[in-house]
């Protein structure tokens, strides 16, 4: 219904991208791209409610392209081969690997933040309080634990709207956190929710940062031109 409405309103539309539509059989896409989190491979998961899958892992065979996301740095060639073997893809299916590249800390409240935070400058005497409201924060947390400073994690459910009590709890935790220097760091998604949260105290705004994330192809693998291959299929 939504696709028909798009075509009706915008008849010149040439491309429609759907998110999380793999299980909708009424839609017959020209290309199916399936994303698989490196830390939660489908071959080690189960159907709901026992696991997280909405479909059998065998449905991977319907994908034209499979992208393994959030790969940690330094994966060995053997690791890539094991993933490929366990997926058991058909010859017509393409397999890609991507990883996150983390940028420098950015203030969530730039007008209230004269304070500059640099992760590389923080030491074991400093503390970082993480605030996440995403489905799988493992990679995010792993990045910060690679530094010498103390890391305290506050994880909320995916798409969480922070309540007054949530904010009050975070404030109290931050105020009692030990460290010569201390900051609050959140994800880009959660930064938007915090920036417009009416309960966030002005006294903490200068200490709140988010870390930009970009996605890059893992160059060490045979197939690393996803965009080019996709354009070939689409014609």
Could you say what each language-model-derived stretch is?
Residues 110-111, 123-164, 229-231:
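Redox- and metal-dependent alpha/beta enzyme cores, enriched for Fe-S-associated oxidoreductases
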Residues 162-182, 191-192:
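A short, acidic, amphipathic alpha-helical segment used as a generic capping/interface helix at domain edges
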Residues 43-52, 106-109, 161-165, 216-227:
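Short, charged, surface-exposed secondary-structure boundary motifs
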Residues 70, 187-189:
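Short secondary-structure boundary segments
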Residues 1-91, 97:
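Phosphate/Mg2+-binding loops and adjacent switch elements
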Residues 95-106:
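Beta-strand-loop-alpha "switch" segments that mediate conformational coupling across diverse proteins
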Residues 27-28, 57-62, 88-91, 120-124, ...:
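Short, conserved loop/helix-junction motifs that constitute active-site signature segments
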Residues 101-103, 157-161, 203-234:
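Short, flexible loop segments at boundaries between secondary-structure elements
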């Amino acid at each position: 219904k939504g696709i028909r409405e798009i075509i009706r309103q915008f008849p010149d539309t040439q491309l429609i991208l759907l998110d999380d539509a793999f299980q909708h059989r009424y839609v017959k896409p020209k290309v199916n791209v399936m994303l698989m989190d490196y830390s939660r491979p489908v071959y080690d998961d189960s159907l709901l409610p026992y696991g997280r899958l909405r479909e059998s892992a065998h449905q991977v065979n319907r994908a034209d392209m499979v992208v393994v996301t959030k790969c940690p740095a330094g994966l060995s060639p053997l690791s890539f081969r094991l993933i490929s073997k366990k997926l058991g893809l058909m010859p017509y299916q393409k397999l890609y690997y991507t990883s996150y590249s983390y940028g420098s800390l950015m203030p969530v409240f730039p007008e209230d933040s004269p304070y500059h935070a640099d992760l590389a400058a923080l030491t074991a005497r400093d503390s970082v309080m993480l605030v996440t409201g995403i489905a799988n924060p493992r990679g995010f947390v792993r990045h910060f634990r690679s530094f010498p400073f103390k890391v305290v994690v506050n994880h909320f459910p995916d798409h969480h709207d922070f309540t007054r009590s949530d904010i009050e709890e975070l404030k109290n935790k931050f105020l009692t956190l030990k460290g010569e220097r201390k900051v609050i760091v959140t994800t880009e998604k959660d930064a938007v929710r915090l920036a417009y949260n009416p309960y966030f105290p002005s006294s903490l705004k200068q200490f709140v940062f988010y870390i930009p994330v970009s996605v890059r192809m893992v160059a060490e693998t045979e197939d690393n031109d996803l965009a080019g291959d996709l354009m070939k299929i689409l014609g």
